[in-house]
Amino acid sequence: MSGADLERRRLLAALAAGSAGACLGGGLSAPAVLAQDAGTGPSLGAPLADDLAARPARWYRKLEGLRVECGLCPRRCRVADLERGACGVRENRAGEYFTLVHSRPCSLHLDPIEKKPFYHVLPGTSSLSLATVGCNLECRFCQNWEIAQARPEQVPGFDLPPDRVAALAGKYGAPTIACTYTEPVVWAEYAIDVAVAGRAAGLRTLLVSNGYIEREPLDDLIAVLGAVKVDLKAFTDGFYRDQCRGERK
């Protein structure tokens, strides 16, 4: 039996047993094998704000008085200095906007691709699936609310840059990487960089999203993605307003 087959059997055994190397937010657990391979593993203490994975954000414009306007989603948050947007993962620092979750996923799994769900994209294969904290909606029925509505300080995360994500997918024979579980729109910079690294390694990157995004970042994402699944929550504006605190656009 090859080393790759042994690694795969170890991983499947860990998944079947419900083994968890670290509990990362709301019961979403990384299997022991993946947790070990992720490198440094989860940082178990709640980090200080200065320790977060701050990277320059894209898709914003500067306003007067050190304020910025985010152009990532239709909320168009206007954010004062040292404040954050509604998603909680993007922060204004002296008139410069930053994402606080780049290369810091809080959930990491090897899932059947049908779980995303994608039924006509490489059926029968596995997808390395990851998420950071954060979302730009507040759905009352969200099954992953513990991480979707959390702030970066509240949930431990892995130090996992895009090239390591691609390497892990390759190691476990996953032909795809899925940005899922929370809302990849609010960590779009990381998702794009993961997709670029994945493409260089011959992998496709998938996005599972609520679709609440502006045109420019949408175009930037689509340019590097292999497939997108949009979760339409309902068909009425009232439902989006009352149950998701957002808009159907």
Regions found by a protein language model. Give the residues of each.
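C-terminal segment of classical bacterial N-terminal signal peptides
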Residues: 24-31
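Short, surface-exposed beta-strand/loop patches at domain edges
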Residues: 31-32, 208
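Extended interfacial segments that mediate partner engagement and assembly in macromolecular machines
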Residues: 99-180, 185, 191
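N-terminal secretory signal peptides and thylakoid transit peptides that target proteins
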Residues: 1-19
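Conserved AdoMet/S-adenosylmethionine-binding subsite of the radical SAM
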Residues: 159-249
